[in-house]
């Protein structure tokens, strides 16, 4: 077991890396890169704010932002106040204006959208914690439909929280082993991202002990699962569709060999789409097949692998599943009921377009993306779209996730809070503004972004921020 500073790099692992690394890269540089702290990076959420507006907004903070070459919304970030104020406690993060995302993990989604077209139906097979799902949603501009699947039950809640914070309403969440989708949803998706579970050899800069229990045998076992996952994903992909396969590991068995296995299995139905032109400088990580094999010393980021494939023809379907999905517990609202909901929502500043449809379950009113409808009855969804409201005393109790997703920036009915008042809001406390709004139900904003819906009670604004989101400790204190 070799120890390099605080980083554990087993000798057998280094042997595998020597074999996997192209001739133009040096092992000494690889080891040195593994010992350097990982640079922090963020991605601007363009569903909330444009990149230019974000840069102008944070300019007074003194943040040093270096563009990520493969993601126009991505930046490496250096901050003088990093020790005093966690990045996740800044106002911009709390309101969903950016996502903390490792730079190399922005690569798979960049590859998925490399042709400039916007797919209508997308699946993210292993979605938690949500960095890539939220990146996909932003590039789709909240249109179409994304099936975001996560096998780990404990991570589904985090996935939903991140989707909600970013104001996304075109996602349906599922909780399955990713190997079910080829049979359950054959040829249903225009684009699929399989960021596969892997041995994590590329994340050692984030976790110095990530490789302490590494073994070649575990790589082979994981690769066997990856082949089953990529086969299932390929069956779920429509002819003409794009499949991006990625990992945060570096050995060939889980990367090139997994893709080659798929190419050999369906030689007449799949082709490689080279990533040579994905961004200036991509050639430094390009393999002879057209994949990107990113060793950490190339771009000073985590290790990663990305392959982009096109399905050129249908393949023989897998046996149809025998399970029963169960009755769908929602019914679409009738026209008159829908009109009443739309009118009431507009009075408080919530609006949406015709790509979202109103559905009801008991006293809950939901908004589902139109593109979700064909999937009803085919698999069970944990949740879809956004919960808009609950019917309450012949009126509506608007839900936090709906306000964050639908109110938009610069809402004319929004009530702008001061920095101190916004901090109180995030701490779950009522706000006592100097001037009181006219409306009883009011969207409170900060930096012109919706924070939630408050109810006026006398001269105070009653806080409705969800208890599970309440923040303690130091919150944003940067100039505004």
UniProtKB/Swiss-Prot annotation:
Q: Does the keyword Methyltransferase apply?
A: yes
Q: Which UniProt keywords apply?
A: Cytoplasm, Methyltransferase, RNA-binding, rRNA processing, S-adenosyl-L-methionine, Transferase
- Please cite one Gene Ontology biological process associated with this protein: rRNA base methylation
**Where is S-adenosyl-L-methionine annotated to bind?**
126-132, 150, 177, 195
Q: E.C. number, please? A: 2.1.1.178
- Tell me if tRNA processing is a UniProt keyword of this record: no
Q: Where in the cell is it found?
A: Cytoplasm
Q: Which Gene3D superfamilies does the record cross-reference, listed alphabetically?
A: 3.10.450.720, Vaccinia Virus protein VP39 (3.40.50.150)
Domain of life, per lineage = Bacteria
The residues responsible for catalysis, as annotated, are 248
Reactions catalysed, semicolon-separated, are:
cytidine(1407) in 16S rRNA + S-adenosyl-L-methionine = 5-methylcytidine(1407) in 16S rRNA + S-adenosyl-L-homocysteine + H(+)
Q: Which GO terms describe its cellular component?
A: cytoplasm
Pfam families, sorted: Methyltr_RsmB-F, Methyltr_RsmF_N, Methyltranf_PUA, YebU_pre-PUA_dom
Q: What is its main location?
A: cytoplasm
**Recorded family membership:** Belongs to the class I-like SAM-binding methyltransferase superfamily. RsmB/NOP family.
The protein's matches in PANTHER family, at most eight in alphabetical order, are given as: 28S RRNA (CYTOSINE(4447)-C(5))-METHYLTRANSFERASE-RELATED (PTHR22807:SF30), NOP2 YEAST -RELATED NOL1/NOP2/FMU SUN DOMAIN-CONTAINING (PTHR22807)
* Record HAMAP family: 16SrRNA_methyltr_F (MF_01579)
Question: What is the annotated role of this protein in its UniProt record?
Answer: Specifically methylates the cytosine at position 1407 (m5C1407) of 16S rRNA.
Query: What is the name of the protein in this document?
Result: Ribosomal RNA small subunit methyltransferase F
Whichever gene encodes this chain, its name is: rsmF
């Amino acid at each position: 077991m070799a120890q390099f500073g605080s980083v554990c790099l087993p000798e057998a692992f280094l042997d595998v890396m020597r074999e996997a690394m192209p001739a133009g890269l040096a092992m000494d540089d690889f080891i040195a890169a593994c010992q350097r702290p990982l640079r922090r990076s963020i991605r601007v959420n363009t569903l909330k704010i444009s990149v230019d507006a974000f840069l102008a907004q944070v300019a007074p903070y003194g943040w040093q932002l270096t563009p990520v070459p493969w993601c126009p919304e991505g930046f490496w970030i250096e901050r003088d106040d990093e020790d005093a104020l966690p990045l996740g406690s800044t106002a911009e993060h709390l309101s969903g204006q950016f996502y903390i995302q490792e730079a190399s993990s922005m690569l798979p989604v960049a590859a998925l959208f490399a042709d400039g077209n916007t797919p209508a139906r997308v699946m993210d097979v292993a979605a938690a914690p949500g960095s890539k799902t939220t990146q996909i949603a932003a590039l789709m501009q909240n249109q179409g439909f994304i099936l975001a699947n996560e096998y780990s039950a404990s991570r589904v809640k985090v996935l939903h929280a991140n989707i909600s914070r970013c104001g996304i309403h075109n996602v349906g969440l599922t909780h399955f082993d990713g190997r079910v989708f080829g049979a359950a949803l054959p040829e249903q998706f225009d684009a699929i991202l399989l960021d596969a579970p892997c041995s994590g050899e590329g994340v050692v800069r984030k976790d110095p002990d990530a490789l302490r229990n590494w073994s070649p045998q575990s790589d082979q076992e994981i690769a066997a699962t990856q082949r089953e996952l990529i086969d299932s994903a390929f069956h779920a992909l429509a002819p003409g569709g794009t499949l991006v396969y990625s990992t945060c590991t570096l050995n060939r068995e889980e990367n090139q060999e997994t893709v080659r296995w798929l190419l050999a299995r369906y030689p007449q139905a799949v082709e490689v789409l080279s990533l040579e032109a994905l961004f200036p400088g991509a050639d430094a990580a390009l393999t002879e097949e057209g994949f990107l094999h990113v060793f950490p010393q190339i771009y000073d980021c985590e290790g990663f692998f990305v392959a982009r494939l096109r399905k050129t023809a249908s393949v023989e379907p897998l046996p149809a599943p025998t399970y029963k999905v169960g009755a769908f517990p929602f019914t679409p609202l009738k026209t008159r009921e829908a009109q009443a909901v739309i009118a009431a929502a507009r009075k408080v500043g919530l609006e949406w377009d015709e790509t979202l449809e109103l559905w009801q379950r008991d006293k809950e009113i939901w908004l589902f993306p139109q593109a979700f409808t064909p999937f009803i009855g085919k698999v069970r969804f944990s949740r879809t779209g956004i919960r808009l409201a609950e019917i309450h005393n012949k009126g509506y109790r608007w839900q936090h996730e709906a306000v964050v997703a639908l109110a938009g920036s610069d809402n004319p009915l929004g009530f702008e809070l001061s920095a101190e008042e916004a901090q109180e809001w995030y701490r779950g406390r009522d706000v006592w503004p100097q001037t009181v709004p006219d409306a009883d139900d009011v969207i409170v904003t900060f930096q012109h972004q919706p924070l939630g819906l408050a109810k006026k009670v006398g001269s105070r604004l009653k806080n409705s921020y969800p208890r599970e989101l309440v923040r303690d400790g130091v919150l944003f204190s940067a100039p505004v």
